[in-house]
């Protein structure tokens, strides 16, 4: 089996529009949670979210292409291009048909879906955009990454709710470890801070509904009351070790195992004894 390392990374997050600013914010303990600005929250039970602030795609996506992308896809294309730059692949010779792209998203283009359903309802089917479907389906995110960077290896999407991004990285890891590819771009993206998205999660009592941003995301506290909806994207460049060494790439880390499970307990709640999480960790350690 091949050894797999990380040679590039990119991020668009609620605490930074790029990798460096995100990393510095994390080190200094900055809080990305604040009041909703992406829509009028006056009818909402929930008022705190973690939005990507002052997002500017212009350095990575041309205006015409961006108009055909949902916000979640804009995030991942920017993050993927940051990862590409960080990896040094732009100055290396490599086979673009040997690059796999695998991106996870739990919901996909919810902003596009909401906008187009509103058009259908108010103005009729003739006003629905021809880009409605190709902008909203989850696999458009890896597709745009492949097209923007010219990668011709397998291009796949993972949809496993909150585990989508992690599963994408694990799937990419295994494809390199087992010798199918030398390079993979893997990660996740989400942009579900819309009125419909927040309403749906709030009505199933999944979201925190208080107004104290410093006590909103406290998953291990006895007073926890739900999660905070965020958005953004993170992409890693995974590479076979010898391939990375041959081009003198900077190596950030090595991935040595990955595990999955399903507790088969409930559609939203995890097993109270953590059986699924335990099994996944055990499988990762033994992988």
Give, region by region, the residue ranges found by the protein language model:
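Conserved beta-ketoacyl condensing-enzyme motif
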Residues: 6, 27-160, 189-198
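Short polar catalytic/cofactor-binding loops
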Residues: 9-16
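Condensing-enzyme catalytic core mediating Claisen C-C bond formation in acyl metabolism
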Residues: 3-7, 30, 34, 212-287
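Short Gly/aromatic-enriched secondary-structure transition segments
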Residues: 18-29
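Active-site-adjacent elements of ketosynthase-type condensing enzymes
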Residues: 41-51, 108-112, 191-217, 259-279
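Structural signature of cysteine-dependent C-C bond-forming condensing enzymes
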Residues: 1, 86-104, 115-130, 147-155, ...
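Active-site-proximal alpha-helical scaffold in enzymes
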Residues: 76-89, 141-142, 146-190, 228-249
């Amino acid at each position: 089996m091949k050894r797999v390392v990380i040679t590039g990374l990119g991020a668009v997050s609620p605490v930074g529009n790029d990798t460096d600013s995100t990393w510095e914010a994390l080190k200094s303990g900055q809080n990305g949670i604040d009041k909703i600005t992406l829509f009028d929250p006056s009818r909402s039970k929930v008022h705190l979210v973690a939005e990507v602030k002052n997002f500017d795609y212009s350095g990575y996506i041309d205006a015409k292409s961006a108009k055909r992308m949902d916000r979640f896809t804009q995030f991942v294309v920017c993050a993927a291009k940051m990862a590409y730059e960080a990896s040094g692949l732009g100055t290396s010779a490599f086979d673009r048909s040997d690059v796999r792209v695998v991106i996870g998203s739990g919901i996909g283009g919810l902003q596009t879906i909401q906008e187009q359903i509103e058009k259908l309802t108010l103005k009729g089917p003739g006003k629905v955009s021809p880009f409605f479907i190709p902008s909203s389906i989850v696999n458009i995110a890896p597709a745009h990454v492949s097209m923007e960077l010219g990668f011709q290896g397998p291009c796949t999407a993972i949809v496993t709710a909150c585990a989508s991004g992690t599963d994408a990285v694990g799937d990419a890891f295994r494809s390199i470890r087992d010798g199918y590819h030398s390079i993979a771009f893997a990660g996740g993206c989400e942009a579900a801070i819309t009125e419909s998205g927040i309403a749906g999660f709030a009505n199933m009592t999944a979201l925190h509904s208080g107004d104290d941003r410093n006590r909103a995301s406290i998953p291990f506290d006895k007073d926890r009351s739900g999660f905070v909806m965020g958005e953004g994207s993170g992409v890693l460049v995974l590479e076979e070790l010898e391939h990375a060494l041959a081009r003198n790439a900077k190596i950030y880390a090595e991935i040595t195992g990955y595990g999955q499970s399903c507790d088969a307990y409930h559609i939203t709640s995890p097993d109270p004894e953590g059986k699924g999480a335990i099994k996944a960790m055990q499988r990762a350690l033994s992988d």
